């Protein structure tokens, strides 16, 4: 990819995204981002060849995400940065969870476009204390803001950046630790069909626990990949 031009106009697509709304409060961001757009603005905004578009927008239909990314390509912007999720790592294991599946499909579309890059985020929180118990692939709001202000991409032709780290959080009780371990065994026993545990996920959610479902599987796979 050629070097950046002297001037780059930063544009955010997805101003309603919760993550972006939190990032927007970080020091320096308001001055750095010239425009923030919603879905409805995509077809009427005047993009320029000097634009770098940070895509926080997400649609549940894969074709809508593809249309959005191809519209940016057709607009002739300098660079598209698609914000994706660490949960896409589970795609080689199962496709039964909607969110990771759709994000993975959009990530593939983004990487098929020559001017696009992909930024992979973990569980996004303002502070580590907000993470679920256990080992988490996590990214702080402040870390995303710093990256947006001074992007550092991998050298060479690599266009995918993983911006996360593993963070260990304590369990609320020995009982929760036991439940976490047992849930993991059940999840792995389900093989490519972990969504069989969805009734149990609803129970865990009602109890205020947040480490179930694709969050558990994603954290497990990232933990393995970073220690192998």
What are these regions, as identified by a protein language model?
Residues 137-178, 187:
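Alpha-helical substrate-binding/gating segment
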